[in-house]
Design a protein with these regions (language model features):
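Conserved nucleotide-sugar donor-binding
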Residues: 1-5
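Catalytic donor/gating beta->alpha subdomain of glycosyltransferases that bind UDP-sugars
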Residues: 8-84, 157, 161-165
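Intrinsically disordered, low-complexity segments enriched in polar/charged residues with Gly/Pro
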Residues: 25, 31-33, 47, 136-139, ...
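Membrane-proximal intrinsically disordered regions of secretory-pathway and membrane-system proteins
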Residues: 174-188
Length: 188
């Protein structure tokens, strides 16, 4: 009875449906006995398909759920939505990529060389580690230390790609399913 028909081009129908139900005042409670097994993507190219689609759906949901941005009406639900989803899909990627040129500008404008120079050096080191992590992943070499900055940058780049995906895929909620690694059945 709480189900509502989604717009046909909805990318994250389960997410939007859940929040629309919560916006009506219902609590979302998950069954503790329910479980699902989902294997990881077959490779990073397949993972990119997922991340771009999820990011596009997240951006789409910001527009579709814009009423939820009203903290006077939805209180804690608004805070949870904005802090867990909206910032990650909108502001964080833009600010991440603005940090490098802004840090350089502050340093060139006479900002503290010790403070901003150190921050800039650490930032460049982080990007180099991410690039090196990417390079190693193309060679099927796994390095946890380098994978962390690589995956962080990978996720934020895919949010930016999600903007383009959303713009190009207007009118369709269909998406290409990412290939997955094989998962063993629990019944074996």
């Amino acid at each position: 009875e709480l189900f509502t028909v989604m717009e046909p081009d909805t990318l994250l129908d389960d997410f939007i449906l859940s929040l629309r139900i919560a916006m009506q005042g219902y609590k979302i409670a998950y069954c503790t006995q329910a479980y699902a097994i989902e294997s990881g993507s077959a490779d990073m190219r397949e993972e990119q398909k997922r991340k771009v689609r999820i990011a596009a759906g997240g951006l789409q949901s910001i527009w579709r759920l814009r009423e939820l941005l009203n903290p006077f009406r939805y209180g804690m639900l608004t805070f949870q939505y904005v802090s867990h989803r909206v910032l990650r899909w909108s502001l964080a990627p833009v600010l991440l990529f603005a940090l490098l040129p802004l840090n350089i500008a502050i340093l060139l404008a006479g900002g503290s060389p010790v403070c901003y120079g150190t921050i800039l050096a650490l930032q460049i080191l982080f990007y180099i580690m991410g690039g090196w992590g990417y390079y190693l992943s193309t060679r099927q070499v796994k390095n946890k230390l380098l994978f962390i900055p690589y995956y962080f940058l990978f996720m934020n780049i895919n949010v930016m790609k999600g903007v383009n995906y959303l713009r190009k895929k207007k009118g369709t909620g269909a998406w290409e399913k990412a290939k997955r690694t094989k998962t063993e059945s629990l019944n074996q």
